Amino acid sequence: MTEIRLTNTKTRRKEAFEPIDRKNVRLYVCGPTVYDRAHLGNGRPVVVFDVLFRLLRHVYGESHVTYVRNFTDVDDKINAAALARKDAGDPRSLEALIRERTDETIRWYHEDMDALGALRPTHEPRATEWIGAMIAMIEDLIAKGHAYEREGHVLFRVRSYRDYGALSGRSVDDMIAGARVEVAPFKEDPMDFVLWKPSDDELPGWDSPWGRGRPGWHIECSAMSYELLGATFDIHAGGIDLQFPHHENEIAQSCCAHPEGGFAKVWMHNEMLLVDGRKMSKSLGNFFTIHDLRKDRGIPGEVIRMVLLGTHYSKPMDWTAEKAAQAKATLWKWRKLTADVEPAGSPDAAVLAALADDLNTPAAITRLHSIAAQEDGALLKASASLLGLLEDDLRGWTLPPAIATASNVIEVSGSATAIVGTVPYRKTIERLLDERKQARLGKDFKRSDAIRDLLVGAGVIIKDTPAGAEWDLGPDFDPARLGEPE
């Protein structure tokens, strides 16, 4: 069996992964707060840990991996969005507006992540469906002396958990000394954090032993992971921005509520995403939602996925238009190579080895380039599938109704791809290239340049060689632009 090695944030080492139960490998990834469309940075952990999910399924069997990714559907930002609609004159109840907003945002999220080629997790719990489990965990923490109630709030007693800060490498005393925020008067200690907070009458709330209120953010993941994966499970993952305080607080809550378990054995964190070398920000004009890239800029989801996988998850990833263009051109060539090919029975050993070595997706992609250079379409298709690439679903490619290659046409209907034997554009392209050749021989360079500009403008790639002009179709080929030159 393939040995998987993963970098464990908790131990700061790359370790051989040994599941608790090979028949049920368990993975939890923190999901989105569903108040607006997912931005490009939200897509990185989804794609990275989708590759991990695929790898685990390949090694241990599809039915032996349980993957949980939650939706946080109770949050101040969600409330604010619903209140804004209410203030704008919507007559419906705030509860109805919140439900509509969260349902709509989850639908958007699924559309975007499906387009990125991400498999759906085994479970996608909504926080509001697990309030009872959260209340039960909070009651248990109070009974064990790890939490206390003040003025309708329930707070976790941070100093009751001696290992607090171990994941992020922080000292509680140092954090207090460096704090620059006003401490709520009902806290015993500045580091204590909220497990439950009161809700105003107009805001969402649930009855509890401490009055009507709603859960704090951190308790949600602790309760849902316990209910769906147990007190101890294999891997907990998410973005590096969640390492502190969210993941640190999850560990404290879960280990104090269930000391018999160890919570997550392995912690994995993907690094941040930059755009053109800078932090993504609306004020800088470099903030993109995945929907923006797909719909407004016409970048296929598969292209976005390949760019995200081009940098190791443990390093900051820089999104640029140049990387997207390169990925698009590469995937176009690979899709043509594999269009009429059945995948090989197993992936390339070097691709599998790269992914098993701490999800080394850049090395895996480099190997895919080598396989493509050997024109082994069957092996390329099987191997790329481990990275969620070259799937039969076109993953957002916007293609003309018929794409000609030197020997066939790919006809696209919806998301299905079919190969047929006619070549409606080949003769046109070759006729134009022959006219260009004759114009050059006759030293009519104005006309030869016009023909070249016409072909290039239509998305035809031309390479002049001593033996004559060679051509191929680029990813932006549009037969409608194959008019006559001036």
UniProtKB/Swiss-Prot annotation:
Keywords: Aminoacyl-tRNA synthetase, ATP-binding, Cytoplasm, Ligase, Metal-binding, Nucleotide-binding, Protein biosynthesis, Zinc
Binding-site positions, ATP: K282
Catalysed reactions, semicolon-separated: tRNA(Cys) + L-cysteine + ATP = L-cysteinyl-tRNA(Cys) + AMP + diphosphate
Motif ('HIGH' region): 32-42
Placement of sequence motif 'KMSKS' region: 279-283
Single GO cellular component term: cytosol
Main subcellular localisation: cytoplasm
Xref: InterPro entries: Cys-tRNA-ligase (IPR015803), Cys-tRNA-synt_Ia_DALR (IPR015273), Cys-tRNA/MSH_ligase (IPR024909), Rossmann-like_a/b/a_fold (IPR014729), tRNA-synt_1_cat_dom (IPR032678), tRNAsynth_Ia_anticodon-bd (IPR009080)
Cofactor(s) required for function per UniProt: Zn(2+)
Annotated localization: Cytoplasm
GO BP of this protein: cysteinyl-tRNA aminoacylation
An example molecular function term from Gene Ontology annotations: cysteine-tRNA ligase activity
Its EC number(s): 6.1.1.16
Subunit and partners: Monomer.
Family, per entry: Belongs to the class-I aminoacyl-tRNA synthetase family.
Record-given protein name: Cysteine--tRNA ligase
Encoding gene (name): cysS
